[in-house]
Structure formats: structure tokens, C-alpha cells
Amino acid sequence: MKLSDFIAANNYTLIDFWASWCGPCRMEMPNVVAAYAKYKAKGFGIVGVSLDNDVESWKKAIKDLNITWPQMSDLKGWQCEGAALYGVRAIPATLLVSKDGTIVARDLRGEDLEAKLAELMK
């Protein structure tokens, strides 16, 4: 599947760039899990784009962090094509994208992510 397939399937999609070895990514993940649980029935989706190199570490982190949304990785680390396409130079990084592909917000975390979703999902 392509990123555009996930985006077209939801009213809003969070593209979450992360990696199993990224401490700040792991710390933020409970906020992302909570947002997904709260808003997925209202047309909110997430697709994770991992900057991992090791498939086992990546899969273990998905399980350990209770990540239930689709995940993608080319296992190329910082050479990830998706990261290059969206200009991601540090993680965690997020893009909130509308159904038509418009970037609505970048790098929302914690309360900022919740506030933006509450505004959009009225």
C-alpha cells in the first residue's frame, strides 16, 4: 500500500515518523495511542513510518507500545524515502493531513495534537 491510500481512507490522517530506538518517540506514543482510540471512529487514521533499520526491533516496539494502526518501513533508517519526501530531519515528527492530501499541521504532540483533533472532529 501507498501512503496516499491511507490518507484517502480517512478524514484526517496523522503520518507519524518514529523509530524503536528514539526515546522521545517512545515517550510520545501513549498520547498518539490515546488520540487514535478517541478519534478513529470519527474518521481519524494514523500511519506510522518507521526509521528503523532492524525489523525485529521495529516489530517489538510496535507490540510493546500497543500500536494498532498501519505501519510502514523500508528499513533504511535515515535514508527512508518517506522522510526525505516530507523533509523530516528529526524524530518524532508528525504531519496531520486532510483527505485531499493537504498538510493541516506539523509536529503536533501531546495536548497540541488533542486540541487540533478536537477542533477538526467537531
Protein language model features and the residues they cover:
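Extracytoplasmic and endomembrane cell-envelope/extracellular-matrix remodeling and assembly machinery
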Residues: A9, D54, L113-A115
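Short beta-strand segments
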Residues: D16, V47-S50, M72
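Short pre-active-site segment immediately N-terminal to redox-active cysteine/selenocysteine motifs
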Residues: N10-T13, W18-W21, E28, A90
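Thiol/disulfide oxidoreductase modules built on the thioredoxin-like
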Residues: L65-I67, D74-M121
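A short beta-strand-turn-helix
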Residues: M1-T13
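Structural microenvironment flanking redox-active thiols in thiol-disulfide oxidoreductases
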Residues: M27-L65, G77-A84
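Long, positively charged binding patches that form subdomain-scale interaction surfaces
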Residues: M1, S20, E56
